[in-house]
């Protein structure tokens, strides 16, 4: 910028109100100059490491470990730093200490005869690791990541060289004193946490924190403690968000899925939702019903027969309520075009059959005591009272509401970040690969505008208070996001939940995937999507989750010549036999992209006691000779804008347009 160009002076005069506001922070020329120098220096630092994880499905142990080991980044750092100077078993032990410092300390202390020496060696090693992971950040940023109690000490250790002649005794003295006064344990724990924090600059969760796993609330607690992250909502997340907003249909779906997989710990223990009214209702109407199609799929859980039978009855009871509520929505919204999900009115109660789409099928279960054949979608008085109570429990769960507010505050349906497009499911397409349109309120939406519309409705469902009609419509759209054929989160032609429970003929169970999944290996499609979202065709990537990659069948997570990456995390144990692995995660550092495939995680206990890490194979997808700098990122764009404004402020000071405060 030419400082004394008259055109620039006019621009500065136009921005004078903003510049006066800026001058309250930078009072004079030296302070503005200092900040320009600082920001310009930051632009030249290597970009921070981004970590992409998807489809956690409530599996908190695997996820927590993945968060701690940063998909193998910490192990690779230890190899880079120590090479062959440390044996593999020592590096494994150090890695486990960094992941689980408090728990591992207790074990290591018991097995070391010379504890004082072990403390000193361990602290030296941890400081080396911390120096390495903090080297791409400014001192100011590192300082903010340090714990208050040990901030000064850790900063001194990070910024001094132990091998410098003049500082050897000073450095050693700090370490010796830490050990002598009994602070070594606390410092080891805090440095390990700092390493975990600095090794990844930004975490991206590409959907489905919730589902059948037992610890979604534990995962949410961990994410709320994370220093820098975002979430792209998944289909299961939307269901919980809808339930927390007050949608009865979403509430029924959440409970049905929880009962289907015998996962009541999140609902009852995590969020304090009382299911006794549902159990009482189920026993009253289905007490003598074996509910065979509703026996929970317990996977690795051990359930006694009485629990299994009770869950099956509760499962059936809430499923019937769900089908009724969904039928009411479909009839209320013909624009959703979901008439193919209206099945209760197709049942012939005399012979136990159902006729739809030109075929008649025998029902495997005809005990439907709460369905009125003349008005099948009407809730009974007791069903209505029950779903009201359950809705109230979700609305009044303090912890659930806290988690969902967080999900809204840092989440969205999609995200453009550093020239990459992140979304959970798909961009709905027609058979010819053109963007599919949805007509809402006599206006057509497709591509980006469709995702923006759904994002708007998702927020209105939770936050809108002024008009019940607006809020109710938005909540219905949340439910559509769960199961609608033009939903970017569902991505199938129809949800066949009723058919899977009540009809044995598997051809009725089929859910045809959106054409997006046929065309996503096409560079041409990816380029059209990039254009739709105004992204660089050469540099950008689409990063997806949702559909597990069946590696054992030869499927690849890298598609469209590297333009699209599928990273379903594979945390869900039910999918692991189908995929052959425990999924993929992605790392994007200053050199490029690293794709890691993972073996199943056994347990936190084994990780700590036996130092069993998640076995990962890493493939370098893109490796740049020139490291990407902060100036190449979204943050870099913001910093350049700040520098531009600060330079304007300098001119305003020098021209006397704004008075300096010396």
From Swiss-Prot:
Keywords: Carbohydrate metabolism, Hydrolase, Manganese. Disulfide bonds: none annotated. The keyword Metal-binding does not apply. Its cofactor is Mn(2+). GO terms for molecular function: fructose 1,6-bisphosphate 1-phosphatase activity. Its EC number is 3.1.3.11. Transmembrane segments: none annotated. GO terms for biological process: gluconeogenesis. Pfam families: FBPase_2. The keyword Ion transport does not apply. Belongs to the FBPase class 3 family. This is Fructose-1,6-bisphosphatase class 3.
């Amino acid at each position: 910028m030419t400082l004394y160009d008259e055109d620039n002076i006019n621009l500065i005069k136009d921005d004078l109100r903003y510049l006066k506001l800026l001058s309250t922070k930078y009072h004079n020329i030296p302070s503005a100059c200092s900040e320009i120098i600082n920001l310009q220096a930051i632009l030249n630092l290597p970009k921070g490491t981004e970590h992409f994880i998807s489809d956690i499905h409530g599996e908190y142990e695997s996820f927590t470990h993945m968060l701690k080991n940063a998909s193998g980044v910490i192990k690779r750092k230890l190899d880079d730093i120590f090479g062959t100077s440390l044996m593999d078993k020592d590096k494994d032990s150090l890695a486990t200490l960094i992941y689980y410092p408090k728990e591992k300390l207790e074990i290591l202390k018991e097995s070391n005869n010379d504890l004082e020496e072990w403390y000193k060696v361990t602290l030296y090693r941890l400081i080396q690791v911390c120096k390495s992971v903090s080297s791409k950040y400014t001192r100011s940023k590192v300082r903010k990541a340090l714990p208050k109690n040990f901030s000064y000490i850790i900063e001194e250790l990070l910024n001094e060289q132990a091998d410098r002649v003049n500082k050897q005794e000073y450095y050693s003295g700090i370490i010796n004193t830490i050990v002598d006064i009994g602070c070594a344990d606390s410092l080891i724990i805090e440095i390990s946490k700092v390493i975990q924090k600095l090794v990844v600059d930004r975490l991206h969760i590409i959907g489905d924190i919730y589902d059948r796993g037992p610890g979604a609330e534990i995962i949410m607690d961990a994410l709320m403690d994370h220093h820098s992250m975002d979430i792209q909502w998944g289909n299961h997340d939307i269901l919980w968000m809808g339930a927390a907003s007050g949608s009865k249909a979403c509430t029924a779906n959440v409970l049905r899925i929880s009962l289907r997989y015998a996962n009541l710990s999140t609902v009852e223990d995590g969020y304090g939702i009382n299911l006794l009214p549902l159990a009482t209702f189920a026993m009253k109407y289905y007490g003598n019903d074996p509910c065979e199609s509703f026996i929970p799929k317990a996977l690795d859980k051990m359930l006694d027969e009485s629990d299994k039978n009770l869950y099956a009855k509760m499962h059936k009871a809430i499923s019937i309520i769900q089908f009724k509520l969904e039928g009411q929505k479909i009839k209320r919204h013909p624009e959703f075009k979901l008439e193919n999900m209206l099945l209760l009115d197709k049942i012939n109660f005399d012979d136990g059959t159902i006729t739809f789409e030109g075929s008649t099928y025998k029902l495997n279960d005809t005990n439907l005591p709460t369905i009125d054949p003349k008005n099948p979608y009407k809730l009974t008085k007791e069903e209505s009272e029950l779903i009201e109570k359950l809705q109230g429990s979700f609305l009044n769960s303090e912890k659930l509401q806290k988690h969902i507010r967080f999900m809204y505050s840092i989440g969205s349906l999609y995200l453009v970040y550093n020239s990459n497009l992140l979304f959970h499911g798909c961009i709905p397409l027609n058979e010819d690969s053109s963007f599919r349109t949805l007509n809402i309120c006599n206006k057509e939406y497709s591509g980006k505008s469709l995702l923006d519309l759904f994002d708007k409705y998702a927020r209105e469902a939770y936050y809108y208070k002024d008009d019940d009609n607006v809020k109710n419509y938005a909540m219905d759209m949340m439910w559509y996001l769960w199961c609608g054929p033009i939903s970017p989160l569902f991505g199938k032609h129809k949800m066949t939940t009723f058919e899977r429970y009540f009809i044995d003929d598997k051809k009725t169970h089929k859910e045809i995937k959106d054409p997006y999944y046929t065309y996503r290996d096409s560079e041409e499609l990816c380029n059209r999507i990039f254009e739709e979202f105004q992204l660089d065709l050469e540099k950008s990537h689409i990063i997806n989750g949702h559909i597990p990659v069946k590696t054992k069948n030869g499927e690849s997570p890298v598609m469209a010549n590297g333009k699209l990456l599928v990273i379903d995390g594979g945390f869900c144990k039910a999918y692991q036999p189908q995929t052959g692995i425990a999924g993929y995660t992605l790392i994007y550092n200053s050199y490029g992209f690293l794709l890691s495939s993972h073996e199943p995680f056994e347990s936190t206990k084994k990780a700590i006691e036996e130092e069993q890490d998640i076995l990962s194979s890493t493939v370098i997808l893109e490796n740049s000779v020139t490291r990407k700098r902060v100036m190449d990122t979204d943050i870099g764009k913001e910093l350049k804008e700040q520098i531009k404004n600060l330079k304007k402020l300098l001119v305003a000071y020098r021209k006397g347009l704004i008075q300096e405060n010396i």
